[in-house]
Amino acid sequence: MKTILDVNNLFKSYGNNIAVNSVSFRVEQGQVFGLLGPNGSGKTTLLGCITGILLANQGSFSWFEGDEFTKARLRIGALIETPNFFPYLSAWKNLEIVAKIKGCEHSRIDRVLEEVQLLDRKNDEFKTFSLGMKQRLAIASALLNDPEVLVLDEPTNGLDPQGINEIRNIILQQKAKGKTIILASHLLNEVEKVCSDVVIIKKGEVLKSGKVEDILNSGKRLELAATDMDKLWISLSGMSGISNLQNRNGFIVAELNEDMNADFVNKSLQDSGISLNHLVLLKADLESEFLKLTQQ
């Protein structure tokens, strides 16, 4: 698979404050690649570095397997933080200005407005738009040059559920068209629903990276109950391959290592004279993995 972006030991600081600390990752063609981290984790700074807005102190990055950066930028559409539009100009007129700056044909304007479902509002002034519509117009501006890659920084920040869903659908539609998307977000649900791959960042450092599916499958947990809960707790505590026991809503929740499974646990407990009246394999979620990593 073709490598779209290769980041190697990127480091960026502001005086004594380290924003990005030796970050490395690789984005492959067709991925929706998530940068997940709490506010202040360095996501925006990292995106600023790889799009040429900021200059890193150390490390390197390359686009499209070593393509010259000035050429590579023409193949990238980026939305970093809040875009600036003229409030008294229409959506079409605002995009016309962006098209002139980017050297894009005006025929692209109606096309991208349709892609973000704003074609019927193209003659309305920007100041009349809702926050969600403003964000969709910003994505339209990033799509004007028909880029191979979209770089989006917190595209659903501050939006209501409907606005979030609209942006999510646009991202998935662009993925279906073959675009590679790099998405920075602090919203776990957003990354879990749209991203194929993720890097989890805290204080500028990578805590974990990989396929979202693999990260979800790595955190197997069991929810158990028996008539004698104290005896069950003691037995589970002494069982290898089980950790992080918790009492939750009248059940015991246990984390399993990769080699452990529910059938083995059930048989081992039966051999110890414990009959379970409740045994459920819990679906892992990105939130639990994220919280576990960021609280370490």
Where are the predicted features?
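Short coil/loop linkers at secondary-structure junctions
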Residues: E105, L119, I242-S243, S275
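Short, surface-exposed acidic/glycine-rich loop or hinge patches that mediate macromolecular interfaces
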Residues: G66-D67, G103, T227, D259, ...
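C-terminal coupling/interaction segments
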Residues: N257-Q296
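Residue-level "edge-of-site" marker
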Residues: V112, F126, N249-G250, L282
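ABC transporter nucleotide-binding domain
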Residues: R168-L256
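ABC transporter nucleotide-binding domains
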Residues: L5, K12-L183, L188-K202, K208
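ABC-family P-loop ATPase nucleotide-binding domain
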Residues: M1-F11, Q296
